[in-house]
A protein has these predicted regions:
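Glycan-recognition surfaces
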Residues: 390, 442-550, 571
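C-terminal beta-strand-rich structural cap/linker in extracellular carbohydrate-active enzymes
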Residues: 641-662
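Carbohydrate-binding surface patches
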Residues: 532, 538-541, 546-548, 584-624
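Aromatic-lined carbohydrate-binding/catalytic grooves of carbohydrate-active enzymes
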Residues: 289, 303, 307-422
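Solvent-exposed, low-complexity, repeat-rich "mucin-like" stalks and linkers
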Residues: 194-219
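A short beta-strand micro-motif common to beta-rich folds, especially ectodomain repeats
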Residues: 214, 250-262
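Strand-loop-strand motifs at the edges of beta-sheets in extracellular beta-sandwich domains
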Residues: 232-248
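Gly-Asp-aromatic-enriched flexible segments
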Residues: 24-187
Length: 662
């Protein structure tokens, strides 16, 4: 009996010993479902870079791994049975020699469960040696592998997880979708009583046409009145449109009234007649992000109609802008592109430009169009090179109020200038074409808002105002991805000192609603949280707000994003003080704040991380003391705060926008 018991004990001990020395299973990263990777460009490469080339980092080749493109993210369910993850990370050598790649940096990070950071590479650029990853995963259930862009160009961010491998005992690591979100409309319905919205500051040059529509919500019918209207201007009591011209420079304070059966709303409008226009950032629509080359007179008119029928006009949205592709293709014979007197001709999709602007103006809005300083536009259509005066006159004669001027083919002209004798400086070459068109626009008896589109070259924010720009693109083109939108928006810190009434940094158009850059549209790829971040951040940045979606297909969520008057008031505040970053934390949270004309602070609490996180703003960081009143601007309700700070939980890629005041 004792021998049998001893044998059983020995067998158990041997089994226990063998189990303790069992080798964990191994799973290469390439074996998980890589379709779950969300990345800004291309598809993940299996044992290849995102460009399909053998993986190489810092001159060292790797046989296996995953090639991706920042920004990218992969969620995994480890089930608590994983033990280790190892890899080598870095920027792939396949972007060597690309000028934009030289300025691009990426950062790899791995977080788990309660937003705990397990690995962070720090910024890496092409040519850097691969950095090893070796992390303990015992007890970890959810793992997120992230590659972020760190400044520089948004292109050529080829990032590799080389030789990535998990060890585990139990269930295999499984790639999963990122957590879903509900598209919750936070904006309360506008009250039935009258409320005047939009800008309270309007700039116009002496003797130039005035067109200002009182933006007001509330039940219709509604009538409008105004006190102290300047000589030369009249108000239509039915439409609320102020039109005419003011001869004498100066500042005029007009008292506006909007009345319906439930009451009257009053508000002051300051009209400044002088050299400055665009005294608060422009708000409107642009055709490119939804229609691109498919734009037409019919679609522009439909956008104007939708601006009215949706009620956006009642919240201060003003401009209806057609982008590229209204002209004749630049490869056509000269006589087909321009009339004998030099004025530019339109293609058959735009039969009558004057009739189109008249239509837009009749609805109380302003009209915009597009050109380039080079021989052809980005889309390959006729542009303004050597016809700047003729084109500016034509735009004014047609009745346009806005010009987007896109660098495009001028790069070819610039290269020829550089090769000539005694070439100007690089900065002078960048400035020259914008100065030429700026002078031409000033010669017109009409205010035409001048929007530079040259992607931030030469630090345009430092000189754009000096040569007549009302706004200037500060980065490359945006697209409807988190990496693009967040990479552009959160890179604006430091530019705030160059912005103000009449001259604004422009981080590009809004990518909410249905977009697509052509006839085939899709709902934005931004999640609901990301869209709230997008609008909140652009308003804090005093960015021009140009809707890029098909206005005829707006859903309630998109409409809610674009009609919150307390949020839009941050953007349209007459002080014109762009927000700056106040704090930036290792967990991906940031706080941005801007001064408001009433002495308050507009504050954005952002979470760029992959998991919910608490975000705090201290009154000391805002330069204020004592108890503060805090208002949630999206929900339009007051919230409680501590005596010296405010803290809230912000979801993945989300935002919480507040106003802090005494």
């Amino acid at each position: 009996m004792n021998q049998r018991r001893i044998a059983r004990c020995l067998s158990f001990a041997v089994a226990l010993s063998l189990n303790s020395f069992a080798v964990a299973d191994t799973l290469p990263l390439t074996a998980v479902d890589l379709d779950k990777i969300h990345q800004d460009w291309g598809k993940p490469g299996v044992d290849k870079s995102v460009d399909g080339k053998p993986i190489s980092i810092g001159g060292h080749a790797f046989e296996h791994g995953v090639g991706t493109h920042a920004a990218s993210v992969l969620w995994l369910d480890l089930g608590g049975t994983a033990e280790h993850f190892t890899a080598n990370v870095g920027v792939d050598d396949d972007v060597k020699g690309e000028p934009k790649a030289a300025k691009t940096k990426v950062e790899f990070s791995i977080v788990c469960d309660d937003n705990k950071t397990l690995f962070k590479s720090g910024p890496m650029k092409v040519g850097d040696a691969a950095k090893p990853v070796d992390i303990d995963l015992h007890g970890v259930h959810k793992l997120v592998m992230i590659v972020d862009s760190v400044g520089g160009s948004i292109d050529y961010r080829h990032a590799d997880w080389a030789e990535g491998s998990f060890t585990y005992s139990g269930s295999k690591p499984v790639a999963i979708d990122a957590p879903g979100e509900t598209a919750e409309v936070l904006t309360p319905p506008a009250p039935a009583t009258p409320r005047i919205n939009g800008t309270s500051l309007y700039g116009v040059r002496p003797t130039h046409p005035v067109l200002f529509t009182i933006a007001a919500t509330g039940d219709r019918p509604m009538t409008f009145a105004a006190d102290n209207v300047p000589d030369g201007v009249t108000l239509d009591p039915k439409t609320g449109q102020l039109t005419g011209a003011i001869a004498k420079p100066g500042e005029y304070v007009v008292k506006l009234h909007a009345t319906n059966s439930l009451g009257t709303a009053d508000r002051e409008l300051k009209i400044e007649v002088g050299d400055r226009i665009d005294l608060t950032p422009q708000m409107g629509w642009n055709s490119w992000n939804c229609f691109a080359q498919a734009v037409s007179d019919e679609k522009v008119r439909a956008a104007a109609d939708a601006m009215v029928s949706s009620g956006l006009i009642n919240h201060g949205w003003t401009y209806v802008n057609m982008d590229d592709c209204w002209e004749i293709p630049s490869n056509r014979p000269a006589e087909q592109r321009r009339a004998p007197d030099g004025h530019i001709l339109t293609n058959k999709k735009f039969p009558d430009m004057k009739a189109l602007t008249d239509y837009i103006h009749s609805k109380g809005m302003r009209a915009g169009l597009y050109s380039s300083p080079g021989p052809s536009t980005c889309g390959g259509y006729t542009a303004s090179y050597e016809f700047e005066e003729a084109d500016a006159k034509q735009y004014a004669d047609w009745g346009f109020d806005y010009l987007k001027y896109d660098w495009c083919s001028y790069g070819e002209v610039a290269n020829q200038i550089k090769k000539g004798p005694n070439p100007p400086s690089a900065l002078e070459i960048l400035q020259h074409p914008y100065s030429v068109m700026g002078d031409a626009l000033k010669h017109q008896n009409r205010d035409i808002l001048y929007s530079f589109c040259q992607y931030g070259m030469g630090n345009v924010w430092e000189w754009g105002d000096k040569i007549g720009g009302n706004s200037w693109r500060s980065t490359g083109d945006i697209n409807d991805s988190w990496g693009s939108m967040a990479g552009i928006g959160f890179s604006q810190n430091g530019h705030e000192k160059y912005a103000g009434p009449g001259h604004w940094n422009d981080p590009d158009m809004l990518v909410v609603g249905k977009v697509g850059w052509g006839p085939s549209l899709h709902p934005t790829h931004l999640t609901p949280n990301e869209q709230y971040t997008h609008i909140s951040l652009w308003c804090l940045l005093d960015s021009p707000l140009l809707i890029g979606c098909d206005m005829t297909q707006m859903d309630p969520f998109t409409l809610g994003l674009l009609t919150n008057d307390e949020v839009l008031a941050v953007n349209q505040d007459p002080l014109g003080k762009q927000a700056a970053r106040v704090t930036k934390n290792d967990d991906g949270t940031e706080v941005w704040a801007k001064d408001m004309s009433d002495g308050s602070k507009a504050v954005g609490l952002f979470n760029r991380g992959e998991m919910p996180a608490k975000v705090t703003i201290k009154w000391s960081d805002l330069g204020v003391t004592g108890a503060q009143h805090v208002r949630d601007l999206w929900r339009q309700k007051d919230v409680t705060s501590d005596s010296d700070s405010f803290t809230t939980e912000v979801g993945r890629h989300g935002a919480f926008l507040v106003k802090v005041s005494k």
